[in-house]
């Protein structure tokens, strides 16, 4: 979907200035709304001249859409140590962001949460994702009891959170304390979580965080 004058006119003034900021425009706060729209359209059309139109991101196959053209991210807990993460980005937002001269990349921010209600981020790591990626397996630490994953966009001078997943709590620290490799039950759990295979594939002391 192209960025049109009618679409911009339907947005609030605050949203227009936020969009102008994403496009790298530095506009005075008292600038007339009509002129703000004009500046955004000029910048958008200039970006189109420099870059080919982006491909639709609805992941359609034979007329059947695999996405709902919304900006969201979801988690499926495959087992205690692996999340299957999938997301979508609204087509118009995708085009606006990727055609901005300020755009650098999309990435996932994986949070380890703590505190009352799991609202505090104790630690995090980032995973850069290609533009066309919409799913990823993520490996978690046994030390984490709760996680959230943010879908983010990296611009030239700042980062923007596009969507946040639900918080998933699995109390992995209890699993870590109870595992004993010499115990048949513990060995079976270790086998199911994939750690022995990871150690065989990556025999170094530092295992990869994600696939």
UniProtKB/Swiss-Prot annotation:
The lineage of its organism: Bacteria, Pseudomonadati, Spirochaetota, Spirochaetia, Spirochaetales. InterPro entries: DUF4912. It comes from the Bacteria. It holds the Pfam family DUF4912. This is Uncharacterized protein TP_0359. It comes from Treponema pallidum (strain Nichols).
